[in-house]
Amino acid sequence: MADTTGRIPLWLIGTVTGIPVIGSMGIFFYGSYSGLGSSL
């Protein structure tokens, strides 16, 4: 992680790509669970 000159750090790529994916998956699972709970 020391040699990041001229390159994008991997942790930055992982954070930028991971947060929207985890957020969308969380919203999807929360919606499905709340939908199941209201239907039951």
Swiss-Prot record:
The record's section on InterPro entries has: PSII_PsbJ (IPR002682), PSII_PsbJ_sf (IPR037267)
Keyword Transmembrane helix assigned to the entry: answer is: yes
Q: Where in the cell is it found?
A: Plastid, Chloroplast thylakoid membrane
Primary location group: plastid
A Pfam family hit: PsbJ
* A single GO BP: photosynthesis
- Topology relative to the membrane: Single-pass membrane protein
Residue ranges crossing the lipid bilayer per the database entry: 8-28
Keyword field: Chloroplast, Membrane, Photosynthesis, Photosystem II, Plastid, Reaction center, Thylakoid, Transmembrane, Transmembrane helix
Entry similarity comment: Belongs to the PsbJ family.
The record describes its quaternary structure and partners as:
PSII is composed of 1 copy each of membrane proteins PsbA, PsbB, PsbC, PsbD, PsbE, PsbF, PsbH, PsbI, PsbJ, PsbK, PsbL, PsbM, PsbT, PsbX, PsbY, PsbZ, Psb30/Ycf12, at least 3 peripheral proteins of the oxygen-evolving complex and a large number of cofactors. It forms dimeric complexes.
Name this protein carries in UniProt: Photosystem II reaction center protein J
Q: Which organism is it from?
A: Amborella trichopoda
Chain's gene name: psbJ
